[in-house]
Amino acid sequence: MEDDGKSSPKLPIPGKRNILITSALPYVNNVPHLGNIIGCVLSADVYARYCRLRGYNAIYICGTDEYGTATETKALEENCTPKEICDKYHAIHKEVYDWFGISFDKFGRTSTPEQTEVCQAIFNKLWDNKWLSENTMQQLYCDTCKKFLADRLVEGSCPFEGCNYDSARGDQCEKCGKLLNPTELKDPKCKVCQNTPRIRDTDHLFIELPLLKDRLEAYIKKTSVTGSWSQNAIQTTNAWLRDGLRQRCITRDLKWGVPVPHEKYKDKVFYVWFDAPIGYVSITSCYTSEWEKWWKNPENVELYQFMGKDNVPFHTVMFPSTQLGTEENWTLMKTISVTEYLNYEDGKFSKSKGVGVFGNDVKDTNIPVEVWRYYLLTNRPEVSDTSFSWTDLQAKLNGELLSNLGNFVNRVLSFIAKPDNAGYGSVIPDAHDAESHSLTKSLAEKVEKFVAEYVEAMEKVKLKQGLKTAMLISSEGNYYLQASQFWKLYKEDKPLCAVVIRTAAGLVHLLAQLLEPFMPSFSCEVFKQLNLPPQFSLSDERGEVLLASRPWDILPPSHRIGTPQPLFKELENDEVARYREKFAGSQSDRRARDEAANLADQLNKTKLSDAKKQKASSKGGGKPKPQPAADREITMARLDIRVGKIVKAEKHPKADALYVEEIDVGGGEIRTVVSGLVKYIPLEEMQNRMVCVLCNLKPAKMRDIVSQAMVLAASSSDGSKVELVEPPKTANIGERVTFPGFEGEPDDVLNPKKKVWETLLVDLNTKENLVACYKDVPFTTSAGVCKVSSISNGTIR
C-alpha cells in the first residue's frame, strides 16, 4: 500500500512538524514472519498513520535490503542468481505488506544505481576526511569452495563465556546478540560444503570509530534524552560504548554489493552493515530528487526509526558515526523505537530456519487483517520478549474485538438503524442538554482523559499503551449503554434516549479515528457503516481533539448512517486446533507433512476394491457405544472446571489453616468448599472473588465439613506465595473453563482410583504473562483467559 506516484512527493514544510519515519530494511532471504512484521514495518506504519491523523507532514520510507552474503547463500540454495533472488523476494515482501495495509510513501530496494551513487559519495567523504584506514585482516578461506568466506557463510560455537551457542553466525550470535568476527568462532564450518576453513590474510578498509567517539557520545547523550529513546536501545548502546569502540571493517570479499570506488579495492564491495542503513537515503532519493531536504535538514526534520533489538548498534553507533564522519549537515536519528523478540508458541520465530507463522501464511487463515494487526500490536514486545499463541489470538479476538469493540459499535448502529417506533430509522437523533445528564457528563470526562492519555502515549511511541487506552473508551461505551438502559429510555424518556444514542454514535466515530493507525480496515468499515468517506483526522488545529469532551457533538443530527454489519467473527476452538497443527514445526516440516498427506490420499484412492468390500456402515447397525469414562484418554476435557464466585468465606471452626467458602457455581447451585489458604490470602480478600472451581472431584470431609469442590490457586516456585486463579471479571458465573484443542464432556465424578486429576495436575502452570495454562494451553472463558496477579512460572493446584 504505497503512494501510487500520481501525487507529488511530500517535502518538508516550514513551520510544520516534518517527520521522516523509517523501518529497518527487511532482508530478502525469506518471506517475513510475524516477528519481523511487528518489530519493524507494522510498528512504523502505526506511527506513520498516527502522524498523518494528527496532521503532521510525515513520510514513511522502507524497502528490501538486498546486498550481502545472505543473498548469495539463498541464491546458491535456490540455484539462481542473486538478482533473481532479490526480484523474487522483493515482490513477495511487497505483496505481504500490501495485504497488511502498510502505508509506505516509498517501498524501494537497495540493489539500485541510486544506492551505489549515495553509498560511494558517503565513502568518498569519509576517505577525504581521513576517517578510514587500511589494514590487513585474517579471514576464513575455504579451499574447497576456493574463496574467502563472508560472515554468514560460516557457522560455529559462540566464543563468549556463558553462551556457547553452537549455531552462531560469523557476524553475530543470535542467542546472546554479540557481534562477532568469523575468526572468533570456535569450531567454524563452511556453510556451503561443511568443511573446516583456514585463516588467510586479506586487505580491507576500516572506519575508525575510536576517533569519532567524542562526537558520537555527545550526539547519543543529548539525543537519547530529547528523543526519548526506548530503554532497550539505551542499554544496548551504552554497552557498546562501555566495552570500547573498535575500528570496524566496511569492505567484503564478495561480488554482490556496492563496489568500492578505490583502485586497490575495486574487486571488493561494501559490508552490508555499512551499506544497508544508507538504503534509507537512497530509497528516499528514488521517492524524490529533492531527498536532501529530508536527509540534510536537521533543523526542520525529525527522524524516527523502528527496528528489532538486534539492529540497535547499527543505528545508534554505526550509521550516526558514518554520517558524522562525512562532516555534512545530516538529519540524525532523533527517536528510536526498539522491540524485543516475538516468540512462537514454544520457541522462536526464525526466518532463516522457517519456524513460525509467515506473512504469506496469514492470508490463508481467513482471519481478517485487522485481527492480525490488533493481535500483534497488543502483543508488541516493547520491553521484554512476548509470545504468539493461537489460543491467545483466539482469546483476544473473541474477548476483546468481538465482545468489547465489535459489540459496542454494532449495538449502537443497529439500534439507530431500526425503523421508527423501534429505533431512529437510520438517522442520528437530535439531542439537547446532554451536559445535564450526569451519566453522559461522567462518560465525557472519562473519554476526554483517555484521549489525552492516548495522544501522550502515541507521541512517545508507546504504541501498545495507545491501543489499550483506545480500547478502554470502547469498554466505557459498553458500560454507558448498559447503565443508561437505553432500551427502556426509548419507551419512557425519548429525549434522554436521544442524548445517549447520539453520544454513543459520537463515540463510535471517535473510536474509528483513534483506532485507524492500528486497524485501518476496521476504521474504514465503521465509517462506511456511518455513511462517511474514509477521511480520518484528529487535529489540534481543527479542534477535533477537543470534541472528545463533547461526544454528543461529533456527529450532526439528521445524519443518515449506512447499513450496520457485524465487524468480527468468533474464532472457534476447532479452528484454533487446526491452525496450531498446520503451522507446527518449520516450513520444511510442513512441506513434508503435506507431501505425506498427498501420498496417503493417493494410496487411499488405489484401494477401491477394499473400499467396495467394506462399505462404511452397511453391516454394523446402530451407533457405536460411548466409551466408558474409566477407559477414556486422560485429557483436560475430563475436568469440570467452572467460573465461580465466592459469596461467603469464613474461618473453619475446627481448623486454623482452613477457610470454608460458599461458592456460586452457576445454575443456582451453591457449593461448600474447604481450602487451605489461610496462611496466604487474608479473609477479606476472599470475599466476592471470581475463582476457578474444579467441580467434579469426589466430595471429601475435612474436619467434619464436606468439601464439594476445589478452588484452584497458583504457588510460587519456593512455595512462599499463593494466589487464586481468576477468570476475567466479565466471565459468566457457571460457564465451563475450556482448554482449546481438548474438547469433550467432563466426567460426572472423577474416579480417585484412575488418578485423572493427579495425572493432569503436574502440567498445570502459570506463564511469564501470568496466564494460567495446562502445558501451553490457557484456561479459557468466553471473556478471555484466566490469570494470576503476579506469580509467573508457578504451579497450579
Curated annotation (Swiss-Prot):
Subcellular location(s) per record: Cytoplasm, Cytosol
Keyword Protein biosynthesis in annotation: yes
One Gene Ontology biological process: reproductive structure development
GO molecular function (one): methionine-tRNA ligase activity
tRNA-binding domain sequence ranges: 635-738
Main EC class the enzyme belongs to: ligase
InterPro entries with a match to the protein in the record: aa-tRNA-synth_I_CS, Anticodon_Met, Met-tRNA_ligase_1, Met-tRNA_synth, Methionyl/Leucyl_tRNA_Synth, MetRS_core, MetRS_Zn, NA-bd_OB-fold
UniProt keyword annotation of Aminoacyl-tRNA synthetase present: yes
Enzyme Commission number(s) of this protein: 6.1.1.10
GO CC aspect terms: cytosol
Family: Belongs to the class-I aminoacyl-tRNA synthetase family.
Main location: cytoplasm
Pfam family, one: tRNA-synt_1g
CDD domains: Anticodon_Ia_Met, MetRS_core, tRNA_bind_EMAP-II_like
Protein name: Methionine--tRNA ligase, cytoplasmic
